């Protein structure tokens, strides 16, 4: 405890009682002076009003945009005389500890800010450096953090890059995100991953094959391609049936690896709905700097390849394979040769 006590953010509405009990236990009879609100999304801000009922003399610390949102979420919350509005770069002295506020707009909401404690060298990073999963489960940080980043923040790479540049000027020894574990070791690894993800670089060499298949013929083509790639020593091949597998993992791997093959049918003059959803998930998150190959199947008037390619027209730095595959109902010998050529090109 310091001369002044600051509580950082609140929690989801479902954890109200547990959280308030934990706060009271840590305070051990003391009263908090400040509630710092970094992010207004309800999974972190839902208990602001409940906190103020429990500790009515607390001053809420936030920026102007946050207070506007707070009024929209909590129509009956009266904070007259209990607001401290901060600007980017402002500091708040608690005694030994000094908190500095760094604005991080669109990481991933417009009001977001992070807070740096220069005494203990702690970065309270809001949603940044968070991950999915439970704290009592041993798992690879990169996997769930990558999926979290791409799903939640993936569209806002430029804004994350700006925040990383600001963070590079700070001596950070601990990162406290609003999701997932507190990070205390090997911080360079986490910063490096965020730099890769937010600049849309290829993280690992490999090929992702994402497909939909109604009667199994497109699936056979995908299985043959995967077999050929493995035979040729491709470093990593992952295959996703978009109608059955986890869409979020398929999106994650598309951003992780450098090459992507999309295989689907022509369906009602369009592409199969799961494939459309998948591509939209990629393009909405600024998918770029990748190589894409196409496998289309149509019993008559095939249009899937043209439609899929058109969906990436606004994506940056997409390289299209020269060798694509056009199936008419079922695999032919010519198709098998096309798949061989596609595998060869993908392995270059």
Short names for language-model regions:
Residues 176-203, 277:
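Short N-terminal or domain-adjacent regulatory/targeting segments
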Residues 8-10, 32-40, 60-63, 123-127, ...:
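Active-site neighborhood of phospho(di)ester-bond hydrolases with catalytic His/Asp-centered motifs
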Residues 3, 14-61:
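Active-site metal-binding motif and surrounding structural segment of the metallo-beta-lactamase
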Residues 62-112, 156-162:
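Metallo-beta-lactamase
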Residues 1-25, 114-117, 121-125, 218:
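Conserved beta-strand hairpin/beta-sheet module of binuclear metal-dependent hydrolase folds
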Residues 4-6, 34, 97, 121-124, ...:
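Structural motif
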Residues 135-175, 179-182, 224-242, 250-348:
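FMN-binding flavodoxin-like domain, especially the glycine-rich phosphate-binding loop
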Residues 120-138:
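Short, solvent-exposed beta-strand-terminating loops
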